[in-house]
């Protein structure tokens, strides 16, 4: 997090490095990278963090499984293709890490009640970027699209299940994503913070061999959902 904050501060340092310059957020700024949005294709990279949760639907009403999530990190690259003046197609493959702990009710033993679910995802989002009219060196935008995750931490091929303390999730999942951000044009590059939600479409849970398993028997579906915050540099 300290490194991410330091990178954010670089933008403002560049903006204020000369006393006689007009800053990005001034009333009448000098227009930076004026022809950038006319580029057909451009690339960048991003750093960020995430908070993954699980949406659990049950077959019958009963005590809910509690999910403790922690803040993970993201890193990846961006390929952007301009389709028209206000519409871009973006591909943002990256590595995402997250960790969750499930607390099951009605277990006397902590060994049975707790299940740790780690995720090391290769994230493949394909997004449409809808940009507004540029105002000075600021250009807000909306994002929407679909994504697929390959979970490198998945143990889907394991023959063991929760009876052997093995909680299993599928390797591939699909999601839809919605969010917004802002392009900030500095003298040498574009800094683009964004926030979006990712919502799982497919069920990720692999059931235990016992259909009446106290860990998976009452679960209709288990889908990931996440808040993703990225700081992109072009």
Which residues are covered by each model-predicted region?
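Bacterial Sec-dependent N-terminal signal peptides
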Residues: 1-24, 231-234
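Short glycine/proline- and aromatic-enriched beta-strand/turn motifs that initiate or cap beta-hairpins
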Residues: 19-71, 234
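Short, well-ordered amphipathic alpha-helices
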Residues: 28-29, 76-77, 125-130, 180
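Gram-negative (and chloroplast) outer-membrane scaffold detector with strong preference
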Residues: 37-41, 49-55, 80-155, 230-234
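Residues that define the transmembrane beta-barrel architecture of outer-membrane proteins
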Residues: 39-41, 69-73, 118-124, 138, ...
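Flexible, solvent-exposed loop segments that connect beta-strands
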Residues: 54-67, 98-119, 150-170, 205-220
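Intrinsically disordered, glycine/charged-rich N-terminal periplasmic/extracytoplasmic linker segments
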Residues: 65-83, 88
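Predominantly the C-terminal beta-signal and adjacent terminal strand-loop region
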Residues: 181-234
């Amino acid at each position: 997090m300290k490194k991410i904050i330091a990178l954010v501060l670089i933008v403002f340092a560049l903006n204020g490095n000369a006393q006689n310059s007009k800053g990005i957020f001034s009333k009448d700024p000098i227009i930076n990278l004026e022809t950038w949005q006319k580029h057909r294709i451009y690339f960048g990279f991003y750093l960020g963090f995430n908070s993954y949760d699980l949406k659990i639907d049950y077959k019958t009403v009963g005590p809910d499984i509690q999910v403790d999530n922690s803040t993970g990190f993201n890193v990846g690259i961006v390929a952007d293709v301009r389709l028209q003046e206000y519409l871009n197609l973006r591909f943002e493959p990256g590595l995402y890490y997250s960790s969750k702990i499930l607390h099951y009710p009605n277990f006397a033993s902590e060994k049975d009640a707790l299940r740790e679910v780690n995720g090391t995802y290769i994230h493949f989002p394909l997004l449409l970027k809808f940009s507004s009219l540029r105002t000075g060196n600021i250009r807000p935008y909306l994002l929407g699209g679909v994504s697929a995750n390959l979970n490198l931490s998945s143990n889907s091929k394991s023959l063991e299940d929760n009876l052997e303390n093995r909680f299993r999730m599928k390797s591939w999942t699909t999601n839809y994503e919605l969010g917004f951000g802002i392009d900030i044009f500095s003298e040498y590059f574009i800094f683009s913070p964004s926030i979006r939600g990712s919502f799982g479409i497919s069920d990720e849970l692999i059931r235990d061999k016992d259909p009446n398993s106290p860990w998976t028997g009452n679960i209709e579906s288990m889908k990931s959902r996440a808040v993703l915050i990225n700081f992109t540099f072009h």
